């Protein structure tokens, strides 16, 4: 018999995880589907060591610690979690949605909440000869353990939030840290730039990487040049180069489903209840778009209760609204 859920949450990043918890708090039968082998989305895959500063109640929480806490929170309820599972199609028949997954099986749901972010992601590559051959041999696009760089000479290429945060974080453990950016000004949050300016991180600006050579001692010789005229400015020798030019995202699989809500780029247009142009289908976090939207984890957390409560009103209009969580008691995965 086909499994029927009240809510199907598609996307197991931090916003999807909190949505699943809140769906449990509202005593719904929920399933959380994630294409990767582990939950946590980009936080787990890209910056588990990075401190996240804009989550309410924390002066800064490491990415992996945030995901661990969200996982513990979800365990309060019997949420059905499907990892290594890609949703290949979503169709609607009468009042139910049929969700087909990559093994060919399917289940049904009364409502859908899309929490896929901007979709799959891959790093923007550095367009310098020889870089691809040196990935894993001193050149990195991802950092999963900051202590891999203890006492190393490290350079970070990039000028956005992630590059600056990486530089200031690693600078506590490295022998030396440099940041290479094409402009004099960094494109990051003001406090992050201020923290960088007060640190001992060496700024190589405005410069670009023009050549990289692996030396006999294992170090990387990086030739830097002026951005405007390609004139060489200086060489630096480092153990590691971390390329942090951001990521390219696409929701190709989502945009291949039979149901197709209106979208704005990679995100779906939503109303004030976080509902898309298809009744019963909601989108939150980076997967949603409305005027003034800020793509932050904190914003997605706030949108989760709105979407879950709206979903409940959709499939059960007579159910009473949400109470205050401080008046609830959870025992053995149930609200009592």
From Swiss-Prot:
Question: One Pfam family name from the record?
Answer: Pyr_redox_2
Q: Which Gene3D superfamilies match?
A: FAD/NAD(P)-binding domain
Q: In terms of domain of life, where is this protein from?
A: Bacteria
The cross-references to InterPro entries, in alphabetical order and at most eight, read: FAD/NAD-bd_sf, FAD/NAD-binding_dom, Fd--NADP_Rdtase_type_2, Ferredoxin-NADP_redctase_2
Cofactors, names only: FAD
* EC number, as in UniProt: 1.18.1.2
Residues annotated to bind FAD: 34, 42, 47, 87, 121, 286, 326
Q: Does the keyword Oxidoreductase apply?
A: yes
MF-aspect GO terms: ferredoxin-NADP+ reductase activity; flavin adenine dinucleotide binding; NADP binding
What reaction is this protein's catalytic activity? 2 reduced [2Fe-2S]-[ferredoxin] + NADP(+) + H(+) = 2 oxidized [2Fe-2S]-[ferredoxin] + NADPH
Disulphide bridges: none
**Enzymatic class:** oxidoreductase
Cofactor: how bound: Binds 1 FAD per subunit.
The alphabetical list of record keywords is: FAD, Flavoprotein, NADP, Oxidoreductase
Subunit text: Homodimer.
| Family the entry assigns | Belongs to the ferredoxin--NADP reductase type 2 family.
Q: What is this protein called?
A: Ferredoxin--NADP reductase
Lineage in the entry?
Answer: Bacteria, Bacillati, Bacillota, Bacilli, Lactobacillales
């Amino acid at each position: 018999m086909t499994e029927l859920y009240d809510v199907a949450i598609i996307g197991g990043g931090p916003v999807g995880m909190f949505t699943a918890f809140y769906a449990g708090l509202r005593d719904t039968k929920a399933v959380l589907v994630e294409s990767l082998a582990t939950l946590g989305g980009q936080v787990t895959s890209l910056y588990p060591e990075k401190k996240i500063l804009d989550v309410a109640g924390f002066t800064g929480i490491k990415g992996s610690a945030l995901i661990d806490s969200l996982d513990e929170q979800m365990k309060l309820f019997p949420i059905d979690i499907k990892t290594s599972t890609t949703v290949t199609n979503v169709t609607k028949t009468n009042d139910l949605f049929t969700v087909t997954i990559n093994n060919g099986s399917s289940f049904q749901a009364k409502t859908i909440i899309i929490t896929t972010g901007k979709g799959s992601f891959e790093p923007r590559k550095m367009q310098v000869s020889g870089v691809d051959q040196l990935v894993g041999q001193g050149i990195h696009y991802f950092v999963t353990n900051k202590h891999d760089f203890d006492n190393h000479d490290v350079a970070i290429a990039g000028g956005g939030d992630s590059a600056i945060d990486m530089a200031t974080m690693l600078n506590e453990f490295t022998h030396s840290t440099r940041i290479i950016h094409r402009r004099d000004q960094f494109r990051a949050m003001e406090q992050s730039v201020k923290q960088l300016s007060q640190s001992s991180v060496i700024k190589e600006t405005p410069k670009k990487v023009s050549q990289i050579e692996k030396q006999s001692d294992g170090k990387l010789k990086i030739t830097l040049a002026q951005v405007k005229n390609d004139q060489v400015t200086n060489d630096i020798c480092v153990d590691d180069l971390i390329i942090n030019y951001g990521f390219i995202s696409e929701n190709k699989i989502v945009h291949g489903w039979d149901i197709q809500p209106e979208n704005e780029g990679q995100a779906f247009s939503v109303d004030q209840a976080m509902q898309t142009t298809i009744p019963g289908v909601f989108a939150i976090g980076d997967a949603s778009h409305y005027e003034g939207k800020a793509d932050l984890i904190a914003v997605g957390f706030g949108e989760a209760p709105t979407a879950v409560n709206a979903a409940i009103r959709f499939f059960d209009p007579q159910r009473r609204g949400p109470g205050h969580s401080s008046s609830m008691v959870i025992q053995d995965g149930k609200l009592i």
